[in-house]
């Protein structure tokens, strides 16, 4: 199959925003609302009051950083601060400013050539979702009874039941019971608040496809799909792809898949996935024996986390690049962390060198890099809810050196097309040092990362790069080197440092 992916994503720099925690605008009325203090520690259920107009009012900040695309965590009406419990798929949460605030955000972002991708939660809804609530009220008589997986015997007997478990029922679920047996319906991960949608039902399929198409026509630039593997039906996602691309052929479809994803990346379902496998490899290489796998209890992600030396990391990178078509690799959603993981700096035990090296790799590797809000100023946090802190807008609290490093890397990527669309060449992997080249036409760059705690003096084979003899230009980092007989000679790297060289 001929795989076609969105052109703009190949050049994109993403920034992930958790709307309740990024910024709040005085234009959103909050009189009488009970909100947690903005600078207080995050809690699982508390609201801080961030909104979409807050994002609008800080668009200058994003543009100054170099961001060209925003990925927003869910924004639809919901009773949770993360909004993965969808009440209404056609209404932006009033706490975020409603549909008009989102319309303004799209207008302002697009005027600045910044794309906007929404988080789509299509596997499950919520207890407050109208169709689910209708069944709770009417039982087997509800027209929506086929929208979910209900215990029909329980419905037909009209036994009184509800979606809010008693202490005894919750204890039964916590001890390994499932919501279908205990409460009478199936829920994602047996979380009572998340009734699973029955996507075998024609009406449900049409509803979700219409939602996807509606917001594309509204003006969004793509969908990030929450737990799409839970809808174990290729035909559902193939039609989703057809509807979305029919509304906008350049729309981006990226799935939250934590494992190998060839099934979905054949050109007829998703354009890309969140590249957690590369994240895991990078953590293993940069952290080695300091890697704390216990911080990553998310699905089967933990099994991919282990310390890696340079040759093992290089082999892993080669393997992961070989999984997918080059057109897919160019638009993979590459990240160091997200709302579902501890922040990278916390995982790295506050080792800023690890974060800088992680960014260096992220911004020189094939695919679209994404920064999780606040990482650029040194925001830290362990597993949820700690990784969802409010953004501190007092710049006295920022690490400006970190932010400047990121700005330089973003500019490096923007000004060197080979880093965005060039071919990838493994060049060196030994003693904690990994080097690779990116080549596009006459432009060639070499990235060298020293993840070890010792200075390294090395010569790097230049096989396949076709360089003539002479000095190299250092475009990032601090090092001097030259080419002699096709090899990079006399390269000296300080411990835990990296460099980008250009001929």
PLM segments and residue spans:
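Core domains of carbohydrate- and sulfate-ester-processing enzymes
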Residues: 133-190, 194, 284-285, 293-317
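Conserved, mostly hydrophobic/aromatic
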Residues: 17, 62, 72, 89, ...
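Carbohydrate-interacting/catalytic domains
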Residues: 1-18, 22-24, 28-68, 103, ...
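Active-site-proximal helices and loops of the catalytic beta/alpha 8
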Residues: 106-112, 123-124, 130-141, 210, ...
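N-terminal structural segment of carbohydrate-active enzymes
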Residues: 1-118, 123-125, 129-141, 146, ...
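The substrate-binding groove and active-site-proximal loops of carbohydrate-active enzymes
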Residues: 39-52, 85-98, 191-205, 221-231, ...
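Active-site clefts of carbohydrate-active enzymes
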Residues: 326-348
């Amino acid at each position: 199959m001929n795989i076609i992916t969105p052109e703009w994503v190949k050049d994109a720099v993403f920034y992930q925003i958790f709307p309740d925690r990024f910024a709040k605008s005085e234009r959103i009325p909050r009189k009488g609302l009970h909100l947690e203090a903005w600078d207080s520690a995050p809690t699982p259920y508390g609201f801080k009051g961030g909104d979409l107009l807050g994002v609008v009012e800080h668009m200058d900040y994003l543009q100054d950083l170099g961001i060209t695309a925003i990925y927003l965590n869910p924004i639809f009406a919901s009773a949770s601060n993360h909004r993965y419990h969808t009440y209404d798929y056609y209404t932006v949460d009033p706490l975020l400013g409603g549909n008009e605030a989102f319309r303004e955000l799209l207008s302002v972002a697009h005027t600045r050539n910044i794309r906007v991708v929404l988080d789509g939660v299509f596997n499950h809804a919520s207890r407050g979702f109208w169709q689910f609530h209708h069944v709770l009220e009417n039982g087997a008589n509800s027209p929506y009874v086929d929208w979910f997986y209900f215990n029909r015997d329980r419905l037909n007997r009209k036994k009184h039941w509800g979606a809010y478990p008693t202490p005894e029922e919750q204890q039964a679920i916590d001890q390994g019971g499932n919501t279908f047996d205990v409460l009478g319906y199936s829920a994602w991960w047996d979380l009572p608040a998340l009734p699973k949608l029955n996507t075998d039902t024609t009406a449900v399929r049409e509803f979700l496809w219409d939602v996807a198409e509606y917001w594309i026509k509204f003006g969004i630039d793509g969908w990030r799909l929450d737990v799409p593997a839970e809808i174990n039906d290729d035909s559902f996602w193939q039609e989703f792809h057809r509807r979305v691309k029919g509304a906008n052929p350049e729309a981006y479809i990226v799935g939250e898949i934590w494992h190998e994803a060839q099934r979905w990346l054949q050109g007829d379902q998703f354009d890309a996935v969140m590249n957690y496998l590369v994240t895991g490899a990078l953590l293993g290489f940069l952290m080695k024996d300091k890697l704390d796998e216990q911080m990553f209890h998310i699905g089967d992600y933990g099994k991919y986390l282990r310390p890696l030396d340079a040759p093992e990391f290089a082999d892993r990178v080669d393997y992961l690049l070989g999984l997918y078509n080059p057109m897919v690799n160019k638009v993979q959603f590459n990240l160091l962390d997200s709302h579902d993981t501890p922040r990278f700096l916390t995982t790295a035990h506050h080792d800023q060198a690890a974060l800088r090296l992680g960014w260096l790799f992220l911004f020189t590797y094939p695919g679209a890099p994404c920064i999780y809000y606040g990482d650029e100023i040194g925001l830290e946090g362990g597993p949820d809810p700690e990784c969802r802190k409010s953004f501190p807008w007092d710049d006295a609290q920022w690490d400006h050196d970190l932010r400047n490093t990121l700005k330089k890397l973003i500019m490096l990527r923007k000004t060197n097309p080979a880093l965005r669309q060039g071919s990838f060449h493994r060049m060196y992997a030994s003693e904690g040092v990994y080097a690779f080249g990116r080549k596009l036409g006459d432009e060639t760059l070499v990235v060298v990362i020293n993840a070890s705690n010792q200075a390294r003096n090395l010569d790097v084979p230049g096989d396949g790069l076709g360089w003539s003899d002479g000095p190299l230009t250092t475009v990032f980092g601090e090092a001097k080197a030259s080419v002699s007989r096709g090899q990079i000679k006399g390269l000296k790297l300080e411990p835990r440092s990296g460099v980008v060289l250009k001929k």
